[in-house]
Amino acid sequence: MCIEIENYKQHDLFNYFDYNQIDNDAEDLLNTLLNISEYNLKLNKRRVPVMEIAKVLGFNIYTTKFNDYNVKATIGISNQLINKYKSNKVIILSSEYTDEEILFSLCYELAHYIYDSNPSNEYSHTYRINDIELRAIRFADALLMPITSFKEAYTELSSNINNQELLIHALSNTFNAPQVVVQRRIKQVINTYENH
């Protein structure tokens, strides 16, 4: 049990859609987890230890080939999972995607755990489409590419790389994130930041 996440989940998150606040909270939660020595979490340069964070949160992680190629991941929280998975918290990721896509999907499922699961109810979702998805996507972006680190990396790399495509590729390698997610993060953080 990760008390830091459980404490955070005590906030009323039902209508929590302020994207700047989500960026800051994701970074604060990450820094809190990184600073707890018993978790032994470390950044690999700028890469966030997403798998290790999920394990600290009590999840068992599995990969499989889903029948539906469009399913990238699913999350389940239920005591009924214990017999099969040896845990009541499971995230299953598609093995048919790149490592970067798998890490993003894991961040996305962690966002649903933080914002949408209720400890008193079982929780399981695979397909979701609505504003809650946008919130989960934003949190996943912010966890995989924390705002401060992303701004620093963007500034550092863009001073040496003038080609936008090469810059996106370099940022993708820096954060181990899908290029499409890097493009979205640039729009969220850099374009917004430069317009103020």
Predicted features along the sequence, with ranges:
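Active-site hotspot residues in diverse enzymes, especially metal/ion-binding acidic/histidine motifs
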Residues: 1-196
